[in-house]
Amino acid sequence: SLVGSEMCIRDRQSIGEMKSFYGNFTVIVKALTYVKTLGREGIPEASQNAVLNANYMMNKLKDLYTMAYDEVCMHEFVMSLADLKKKTGISAMDIAKGLLDNGIHPPTMYFPLIVEEALMVEPTETESKETLDEAVEVLRKLYEIAETDAEQLHQAPVTTPVTRMDEVGAARHPYLRYEWQD
């Protein structure tokens, strides 16, 4: 029996082993697989779900967080945490790190660049209402923590295998290669 890359190379159903020479070809294969899996009816439904999910979350959060663009959105919405930072010292980075402590992958931070303390939230089309509600609840809880115990968020994440790194130190003194132990 064949294992690993041997199976890819020798299996007549396979496209073969992928090499870096082909650039983003694997991304195209994944996209094609996604399109073929969803089909003609599934693509519009997935798109509608992405838009619905983003608008649902945005409307559940806009009473606390400042929306950069407070109007119906497409598949993403942008929050500005500039007011929260001025009031509490908690940045978009702190909220993102707090999300990690709660088992949620953080949204895109500091983009778009024209929005101060931006968090760009893109809930995917496959998220259930329950997971969206959980994310909203966590974001609301983090806002409350920002107002009552900012230091807790400045220390986050504390439950992940790798805790918050010294970003200034990492930028000024980069460690770019691993030293193997003999």
Give the positions of each predicted feature:
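Short, small-residue-biased leader/transition segments that mark boundaries at the very start
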Residues: 2-9
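Short hydrophobic/aromatic-rich motifs at helix boundaries and adjacent loops
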Residues: 5, 29-31, 68-69
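Non-catalytic terminal extensions of PLP-dependent enzymes
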Residues: 11-12, 35-182
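A structural-propensity feature for long, helix-poor, extended segments
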Residues: 14-17
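PLP-dependent aminotransferase class I/II
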Residues: 19-32
